[in-house]
A protein has these predicted regions:
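Long alpha-helical, hydrophobic tracts
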Residues: 1-67
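Long, charge-patterned amphipathic interaction tracts in eukaryotic proteins
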Residues: 37-253
Length: 253
C-alpha cells in the first residue's frame, strides 16, 4: 500500500478522535473505509490490466501477518478479535484466531492488512472509551448487572453497529466509482470477486488452523439488553472524541 493512502486513512481517524462532534467523527471513520475500498478497487483494476504481462496479483504478494490483540486471559480479547474480523471482512482479509484469543493472523494483501490494522486500532479505542464513559455515569448499576457483563454486552452492540456502518461505507465506495471507458476492462464487482477468490486460495494453502473460534460469547452467562442498545447507539455515532482515546491498544477487561 502506498504511504500516501495509509497517511490519509490515519489522518482521517486522527480527526475523528480529535472532535467532540459525533456526526463529524462518524463521517471521518466512514470516509476512511471508503478510501480503503476505493484503493482496493483501483489496485485490482490495475492488476487486471496487467494480467497478460504479469502473474495475477501484480507486484504485491499475498502475506500472512500476526497481530497481538491483548494479554493472554484478558476478557476483552474476544471482542477485540471480533472487531478485527468485522473490519477484515470488508477489506478482503481472512482471519485465524489463536486458541486463547490473544492474537490474530491476517491473510491478504499487505495494503489491506495495513488498512485493517489502522481501522481496528482506532475503533477498539473508540469502543473502550464509549463504554467507560457510560459506566462512569452508572449505567451498569441501573441495568442491574455486573460491570463486566454490562461492558461485554455494550461491546456486542457496538461491534454490530460498526459492522453495519463499515459495510455501508464499502458499498457506497463501490457504487460511486465511475465505470471505466476502457474497452474490455472488467467490472468492479468482477475484480473484487476475483480478488476474494485469490485471497481464499492463498488462505487455503497457508493456513494450518484447526477447529473453530468459539466467539465472543464463550464462557458468558449473562447479558444486558440495555447495554447492547447503548453499544449500538455509540457504534452508529462513532463518538471518538472521548477522554482516553489516545491510549491506543488499551481495552479494559
Amino acid at each position: 500500500v502506498s504511504d500516501r493512502l495509509v497517511d490519509r486513512v490515519g489522518k482521517l481517524l486522527a480527526q475523528a478522535e480529535g472532535t467532540d462532534n459525533e456526526h463529524e467523527a462518524a463521517a471521518f471513520v466512514e470516509r476512511a473505509q471508503q478510501l480503503a475500498t476505493e484503493h482496493a478497487v483501483d489496485l485490482e483494476l490495475a492488476r487486471a490490466r496487467q494480467r497478460d504481462r504479469q502473474h495475477r496479483g501484480g507486484g504485491e504478494p499475498l502475506v500472512q501477518e500476526r497481530l497481538a490483540v491483548g494479554q493472554r486471559g484478558q476478557r476483552g480479547n474476544r471482542h477485540r478479535v471480533l472487531l478485527y474480523t468485522v473490519v477484515a471482512a470488508v477489506n478482503d482479509v481472512m482471519v485465524n484466531v489463536s486458541h486463547d484469543s490473544s492474537y490474530v493472523l491476517g491473510f491478504g494483501h499487505r495494503s489491506d492488512l495495513e488498512v485493517v490494522e489502522r481501522l481496528w486500532s482506532s475503533l477498539a479505542v473508540q469502543m473502550a472509551a464509549a463504554a467507560q464513559r457510560r459506566m462512569d455515569k452508572g449505567e451498569h448499576r441501573a441495568a442491574g448487572v455486573t460491570g463486566l457483563s454490562w461492558r461485554l454486552s455494550f461491546y456486542d452492540g457496538f461491534i454490530d453497529a460498526v459492522s453495519t456502518r463499515l459495510q455501508r461505507a464499502r458499498e457506497v465506495a463501490i457504487e460511486q466509482r465511475q465505470p471505466s471507458e476502457v474497452a474490455g476492462e472488467p467490472s468492479t464487482a468482477l475484480v473484487l470477486r476475483e480478488k476474494s477468490e485469490r485471497v481464499q486460495s492463498f488462505y487455503d494453502t497457508a493456513s494450518d488452523a484447526r477447529g473453530s473460534w468459539r466467539g465472543a460469547w464463550s464462557g458468558r452467562t449473562r447479558s444486558s439488553r440495555t447495554a447492547r442498545e447503548s453499544g449500538r447507539t455509540d457504534g452508529a455515532r462513532a463518538d471518538l472524541g472521548q477522554p482516553g482515546v489516545r491510549r491506543r491498544g488499551q481495552l479494559p477487561a
